[in-house]
């Protein structure tokens, strides 16, 4: 059934343990007294098909900041909740065809102290779609937080993922319920596929529906033209949101990403506006320096200006590609960096008014 490789600081005396080698300094291996460079092994393993399936490509867009961008105030104060304090805010997660991060998301919310409700969006028949829309509206009208979880909605339908969810969001009934949620101080979160839907519906970066134009930002295929699944480092770029409460500009986190279309594409004029408004929430960063970067694999998809996540102008809506919900104690233990990104705790604290 396979074996487990364990690195230990002392000899293991377990009956089935077998010593296979010792760790040495440098980037080479010594096997049967023959010294082999790590780069040679990587080329032998990956070089044959690297031209067809590259593991990394030079960034197609190199600028780290739009020209003439005014500096952002280091730490902006997020808005506060004007309603009555809620000890256990209600989170609603609609589960669409292809959503696959709802369990992890619900678990993370419950751990943070929220109550969670989920519903299945059924699309087998027209009647199923209509009843699912009515069910969504009912839950959105009762919830404090609306989350669109990650996945591959409708199998990442042709010519861009997230369109199925975006079409539901733009339904007149659903859209009215979402607008009412925003007006009463509610929060909205979209991760990965959910981020794609927020962007393609106009909720990000505009904060309301019906604003999408040909010049609007979008999320496009990764530069390597295939799915990526890895850990990345992101750096905090603003604090102007309840989601980012307690963070400081420059803080870094180690976050899992898994997507085929995560490249944030935006024109220079709108990017300048996003930076100056404090709407760029997170950026891909070099783990050694903590500085934003366009270089792969640290910026795994080639996102313009190294943007990983953005917020609406009022800070109530956050969208990001990294799967913050996938970390818990005992996971990613061999990955360096701060893996606790307290988005869920911050949202709960916002409603508790603490």
Give the location of each predicted region:
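Beta-strand->loop->alpha-helix junctions that form or flank phosphate-binding loops
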Residues: 12-35, 117-123, 216-219, 225, ...
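Cysteine-nucleophile active-site neighborhood
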Residues: 149, 153-240
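Amide-donor transfer/coupling interface in amidating biosynthetic enzymes
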Residues: 131, 135-138, 177-180, 211-354
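Intein/HINT protein-splicing elements and their conserved insertion hotspots or analogous self-processing inserts
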Residues: 9-90, 98, 107
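Generic beta-strand/beta-sheet core signal
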Residues: 7-9, 20-23, 32, 94-96, ...
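Extended, subdomain-level signal for the structured scaffold at the beginning of enzyme domains
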Residues: 74, 79-161, 171, 244-245, ...
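Short cationic amphipathic helices and targeting signals
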Residues: 1-11
């Amino acid at each position: 059934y396979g074996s487990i490789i364990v690195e230990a600081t002392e000899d293991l005396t377990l009956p089935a343990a077998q010593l296979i080698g010792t760790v040495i300094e440098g980037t080479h291996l010594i096997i049967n007294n023959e010294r082999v460079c790590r780069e040679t092994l990587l080329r032998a393993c990956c070089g044959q098909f690297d031209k067809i399936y590259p593991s990394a490509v030079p960034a197609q867009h190199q600028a780290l900041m739009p020209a003439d961008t005014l500096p952002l105030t280091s730490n902006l104060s997020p808005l506060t909740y004007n309603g009555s304090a809620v000890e256990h805010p209600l989170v609603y997660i609609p589960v669409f065809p292809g959503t696959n991060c709802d369990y992890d998301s619900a678990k993370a919310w419950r751990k943070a102290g929220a109550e969670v409700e989920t519903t299945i969006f059924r699309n087998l028949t027209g009647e199923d779609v209509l009843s699912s829309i009515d069910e969504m509206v009912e839950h959105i009208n009762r919830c404090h937080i609306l989350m669109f979880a990650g996945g591959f909605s409708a199998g990442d339908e042709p010519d861009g993922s997230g369109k199925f969810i975006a079409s539901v969001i733009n339904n007149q009934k659903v859209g009215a319920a979402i607008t009412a949620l925003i007006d009463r101080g509610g929060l909205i979160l979209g991760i990965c596929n959910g981020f794609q839907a927020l962007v393609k519906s106009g909720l990000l970066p505009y904060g309301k529906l019906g604003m999408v134009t040909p010049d609007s930002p979008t999320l496009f295929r990764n530069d390597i033209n295939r799915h990526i699944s890895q850990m990345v480092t992101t750096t905090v770029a603003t604090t102007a949101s309840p989601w980012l409460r307690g963070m400081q500009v420059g803080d870094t986190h180690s976050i899992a990403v898994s997507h085929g279309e995560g490249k944030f594409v935006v024109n220079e004029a709108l990017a300048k506006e996003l930076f100056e408004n404090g709407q760029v929430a997170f950026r891909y960063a070099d783990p050694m320096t903590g500085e934003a970067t366009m270089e792969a694999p640290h910026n795994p998809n080639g996102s313009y200006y190294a943007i990983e996540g953005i917020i609406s102008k009022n800070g109530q809506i956050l969208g990001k590609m990294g799967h913050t919900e996938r970390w818990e104690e005992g996971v990613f233990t061999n990955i360096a960096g701060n893996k606790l990104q307290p988005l869920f705790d911050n949202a709960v604290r916002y409603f508790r008014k603490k």
